[in-house]
Amino acid sequence: MAKLIMLISGLSAGLAVILGAFASHGLKKKISAEMISVFKTGVDYQFYHSFAMAFVGLSLMVGGADQSNLLTWAFICFGIGIIFFSGSLYLLALTQKKIFGPITPLGGLFFILGWVFFSLHWIN
């Protein structure tokens, strides 16, 4: 499981690099500066939580056989958070349809849950 988590976190971080470059170079003449900022916020949070998923993977590697379900839940929540939070910001910026706005806080909630599960693992 740890290797899969490391693979997914690396792919997610790599995708964030691609999306960040796209925001900086490919979107300048296509969407407003405000929407580019929204898009880049999605990129930032995707980066942060890609690294968080890597921390989960490393924690599983350090723990050896003593693998915690809390870490698995942390990984799942970080992944869902990226999809909902960053994904909704990408869609909002690209389509400018406000319907995607309410999805963003749900992603934020999953980020918070991920950090709670990650923290609980280390205090148990």
What are these regions (language model features)?
Residues 1-124:
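Polytopic transmembrane helical bundles with strong interfacial aromatic enrichment
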